[in-house]
Curated annotation (Swiss-Prot):
Entry keyword set: Ribonucleoprotein, Ribosomal protein
Protein name from the UniProt record: Large ribosomal subunit protein bL32
Keyword DNA repair assigned: no
GO terms classed as biological process: translation
Stored SUPFAM superfamilies: Zn-binding ribosomal proteins
Family: Belongs to the bacterial ribosomal protein bL32 family.
Source species, domain of life: Bacteria
Length: 59
């Protein structure tokens, strides 16, 4: 069984756990519709992504 050679210091433990916290999702205002959407995601209202229509929107 593997056993640690040295004790992990509280600073090292804290640095390891720093990424464990949940972060609030980021939203940006869409240039075309003005709706809020996630970055690098399709705007579901218009079906546009990076200036191109990639999704046919149902009315």
């Amino acid at each position: 069984m593997a056993v640690p050679k040295r004790k992990t210091s509280p600073a090292k433990r804290g640095m390891r756990r720093s990424a464990d916290a949940l972060k609030a999702p980021t939203y940006i205002e869409d240039k075309n519709s003005g709706e809020l959407r996630r970055p690098h995601h399709i705007d579901l209202k218009t079906g546009m992504y990076r200036g191109r229509s990639v999704l046919v929107v149902k009315d």
